[in-house]
């Protein structure tokens, strides 16, 4: 698929993946070479993070997505061309891999023992591709405002765990939003332009 080909080198679009506990405890930080990520941005996201809910910040041509699982906050920062659902899918596979690797160690973890997580950094880039190939589906939606077809990234878990169908999602683009209704087979069952605020 052309959209997946666009992200063949997905790591070039990702600025940073940060895993930490509080303002003083960094567990893992993967950063793309020649990228400036300010520590204050990571600390702000860690303070704002909520359990089980992906939060988004968009500024300066970058998107930040973050979530808290137990006491650990997972953060990803990417170019604003990367859709939020793909960033969330990357965090999903990152959280699963992290807890699969370290869950037993985390219960006895003490602040200052962060060097034991160093090996996880080498797993992060392959997780980008895993998320892209296994955890998302691309659907094509037509917007009547801009008279164009758009490839929209949808997390498989979003549809598979939906409480009812069709599930609804808003694709924000070019200053407006397109509300899309998706069934359990990832087929579009309706769409309409909606107003956005925030």
Predicted regions and their residues:
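A cross-kingdom feature marking solvent-exposed beta-strand/loop segments within repeated
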Residues: 57-58, 162-165
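Short metal-binding segments enriched for Cys and/or His
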Residues: 169-196
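Long, contiguous alpha-helical scaffold regions
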Residues: 72, 137, 194-198
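Short functional micro-motifs and their immediate structural scaffolds
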Residues: 148-151
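Acidic, low-complexity cytosolic segments
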Residues: 1-134
């Amino acid at each position: 698929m052309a959209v997946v080909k666009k992200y063949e080198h997905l790591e070039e679009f990702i600025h940073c993946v940060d895993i930490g506990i509080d303002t003083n405890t960094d567990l893992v930080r993967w950063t793309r070479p020649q990228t400036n990520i300010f520590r204050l941005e990571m600390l702000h996201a860690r303070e704002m993070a909520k359990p089980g809910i992906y939060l988004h910040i968009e500024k300066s041509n970058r998107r930040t997505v973050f979530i808290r699982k137990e006491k650990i906050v997972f953060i990803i920062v990417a170019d604003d061309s990367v859709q939020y659902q793909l960033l969330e899918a990357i965090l999903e596979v990152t959280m699963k891999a992290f807890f699969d690797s370290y869950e037993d160690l985390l219960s006895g973890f003490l602040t200052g023992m962060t060097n034991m997580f160093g090996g996880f950094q080498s797993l992060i880039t392959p997780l980008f591709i895993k998320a892209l190939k296994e955890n998302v589906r691309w659907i094509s939606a037509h917007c009547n405002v801009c008279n164009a077809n758009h490839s929209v990234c949808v997390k498989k878990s979003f549809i598979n765990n939906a409480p009812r169908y069709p599930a609804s999602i808003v694709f924000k683009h070019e200053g407006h939003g397109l509300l899309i209704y998706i069934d359990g087979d990832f087929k579009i069952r309706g769409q309409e332009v909606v107003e956005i605020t925030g």
